[in-house]
């Protein structure tokens, strides 16, 4: 293997010239050949005149038939990395994704661009499923989206053998690892791809994977001498702000913050459906328009609220973790959490939906001891010993993150195996960058005394 680190900043010209994604490490078995013209289809279908350099290398790795592992931050352009080679190959890329709604959104967007794509899932009528399978066998699709559950069905492998498959792309690949923050047992079934399609390349894509999870992904998918593309986890345009709140502080601080962010979008994450509804009502009563988004809403209502938020009709959306996957909105100026996330990985992925345009954005965590206690209570209820141990480990790491006096950026990067050179990031509350509205006391509420734990 040839292992090297690219020594230049990778500029994302597809969204904003200020946005940079720095490569952490690139490992390839052999340099991919560069003859194929990729700029013409990139310009014709996506409207971009140039790549982010990591994107082009990933595309060429797949066109060269290499197994590939990609770790790239939220909003880094991972989807294009498998959509473009699928288009250029003239065959069908089979994309495995965990959420039906996300697959449907991507397939619809591709269809609007003139790229034939389809989703095969159980929500389709039997005749519609048969039609999709027939067109797939005829090679009419450039991308075919399946859930891991669908792939696990005994009949799926049989008819997939009749499809002209270019490669398999595993989205949200961290779901395959028991050490990942979103482990899904059905993802373990994906190991059968290597058995039944030994000659086809497999590509794994994720935004948040520690070294341990990355090794697990490679092992579970049985990737052969894979090309590895690991982008830097440092999002320098984001400001991480953490505050432990006393009983009456949290909602007052939320209102302060929303009145401060008058330009751009805001996502507010609440831990439960009830808290989503309560928060929306609280904000509306104070003259701040906000929309809810959670799993108990009717599908059309969720979709309508998402569209109103995306179209700039309403600035603030309050949701559970169900909101965000696949959302491509560059102008989010703040992501605010109203409870302690279950893990650093979850927080990094959700907070990373801010500032995708490369401009400054804030990631604010307003947590309370009661929510941390509730999280610990549910971990205590887990019956599987191994899963309980992993959950406690994730819990203690996120607690150290919020309690520590170490730079927030450094803590996040260290968690993913990356060391920042700067001791003082200048872009987090620990390094003295908290805005006045967040650091000022709330009237009538005794502020929480800062408690520091050892740095990570």
Residue ranges and their predicted role:
Residues 371-410, 414-418:
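A conserved SF2-helicase RecA2
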């Amino acid at each position: 293997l040839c292992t090297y680190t690219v020594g230049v900043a990778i500029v994302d010209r597809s969204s904003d010239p200020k946005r940079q994604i720095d490569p952490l490490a690139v490992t390839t078995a052999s340099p991919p050949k560069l003859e194929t013209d990729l700029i013409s289809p990139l310009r014709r279908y996506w409207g971009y005149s140039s790549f982010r350099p990591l994107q082009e290398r990933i595309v060429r790795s797949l066109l060269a038939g290499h197994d590939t592992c990609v770790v790239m931050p939220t909003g880094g352009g991972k989807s294009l990395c498998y959509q473009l080679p699928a288009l250029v190959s003239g065959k069908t890329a089979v994309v495995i994704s965990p959420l039906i709604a996300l697959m449907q959104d991507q397939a619809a967007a591709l269809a609007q661009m003139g790229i034939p794509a389809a989703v095969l899932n159980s929500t389709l009528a039997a005749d519609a499923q048969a039609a999709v399978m027939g067109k797939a066998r005829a090679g009419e699709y450039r991308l075919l989206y399946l859930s891991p559950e669908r792939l696990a069905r005994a009949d799926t492998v049989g008819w997939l053998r009749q499809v002209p498959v270019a490669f398999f792309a595993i989205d949200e690949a961290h779901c395959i690892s028991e050490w990942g923050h979103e482990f899904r047992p059905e993802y373990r079934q994906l190991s059968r791809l290597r058995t039944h399609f030994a000659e086809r390349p497999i590509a794994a894509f994720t935004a948040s994977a520690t070294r341990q999870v990355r090794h697990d992904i490679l092992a579970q998918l049985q990737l052969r001498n894979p090309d590895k593309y690991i982008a830097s986890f440092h999002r320098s345009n984001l400001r991480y702000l953490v505050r432990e709140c006393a009983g009456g502080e949290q909602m007052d601080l939320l209102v302060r913050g929303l009145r401060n962010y008058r330009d751009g979008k805001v996502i507010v994450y609440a831990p439960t459906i009830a808290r989503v509804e309560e928060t929306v009502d609280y904000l509306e009563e104070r003259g701040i328009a906000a929309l809810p988004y959670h799993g108990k809403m009717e599908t059309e209502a969720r979709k309508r609220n998402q569209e109103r938020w995306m179209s700039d009709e309403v600035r603030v959306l309050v949701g559970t973790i169900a909101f965000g996957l696949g959302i491509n909105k560059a102008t989010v100026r703040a992501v605010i959490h109203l409870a302690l996330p279950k893990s650093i990985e979850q927080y990094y992925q959700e907070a990373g939906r801010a500032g995708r345009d490369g401009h400054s954005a804030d990631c604010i965590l307003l947590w309370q001891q009661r929510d941390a206690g509730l999280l610990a209570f549910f971990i205590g209820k887990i019956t599987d010993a191994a899963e309980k141990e992993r959950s406690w480990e994730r819990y203690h790491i996120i607690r150290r993150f919020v309690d520590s006096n170490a730079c927030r950026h450094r803590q996040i990067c260290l968690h993913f195996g990356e060391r920042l050179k700067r001791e003082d990031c200048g872009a987090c509350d620990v390094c003295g960058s908290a805005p006045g509205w967040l650091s000022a006391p709330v009237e009538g509420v005794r502020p929480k005394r800062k408690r520091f734990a050892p740095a990570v």
